[in-house]
C-alpha cells in the first residue's frame, strides 16, 4: 500500500506519533530517520528504509513496517505489493535516538531485487 497522509503526507507534516516519542527523535535535515529491519529470531540484517514520524507511528500501531519512499514521495507498507510482509516484533531507538531498529518476522524476500536481504550481493570485506 502506498499513500500520503490526509494532510499531504511526508516528512515535517503533522503526525499522530506520541509526543513523548517524537520529542526524542533526532531526524535528518529532511525529517527522516534510517530504519534498519532485522530478522527477530536470527539477527540477520534485512534492509534499510526511511521513516518520518508518521511512518513510525503507523509501524508502531499496525504491526507492519511502513516506510517513506524518498524517490516516490509517499508511504509504503512492506508487503502490500510484493506479498513479502514484515511483521513487527519490536522497535527500538539507538542511543542517539537518530536510528530505528525494527525487529521483524520477514515473509519472503526483504530486498526489492527478490533476495532475502539487501546485503548479500556486494560484499566488500569478508572473513577468509
Curated annotation (Swiss-Prot):
Its cofactor is Mg(2+); Zn(2+). Belongs to the PRA-CH family. Keywords: Amino-acid biosynthesis, Cytoplasm, Histidine biosynthesis, Hydrolase, Magnesium, Metal-binding, Zinc. Zn(2+) binds at residues 95, 111, 118. It is found in: Cytoplasm. Pfam families: PRA-CH. Binds 1 Mg(2+) ion per subunit. Binds 1 zinc ion per subunit. It comes from Streptomyces coelicolor (strain ATCC BAA-471 / A3(2) / M145). Catalyzes the hydrolysis of the adenine ring of phosphoribosyl-AMP. It is an enzyme of class 3 (hydrolase). HAMAP family: HisI (MF_01021). GO terms for cellular component: cytoplasm. Its EC number is 3.5.4.19. GO terms for biological process: L-histidine biosynthetic process. One of its GO terms (molecular function) is zinc ion binding. Homodimer. Mg(2+) binds at residues 94, 96, 98. It catalyses: 1-(5-phospho-beta-D-ribosyl)-5'-AMP + H2O = 1-(5-phospho-beta-D-ribosyl)-5-[(5-phospho-beta-D-ribosylamino)methylideneamino]imidazole-4-carboxamide. It comes from the Bacteria. Pathway: Amino-acid biosynthesis; L-histidine biosynthesis; L-histidine from 5-phospho-alpha-D-ribose 1-diphosphate: step 3/9. This is Phosphoribosyl-AMP cyclohydrolase. The lineage of its organism: Bacteria, Bacillati, Actinomycetota, Actinomycetes, Kitasatosporales. The gene is hisI.
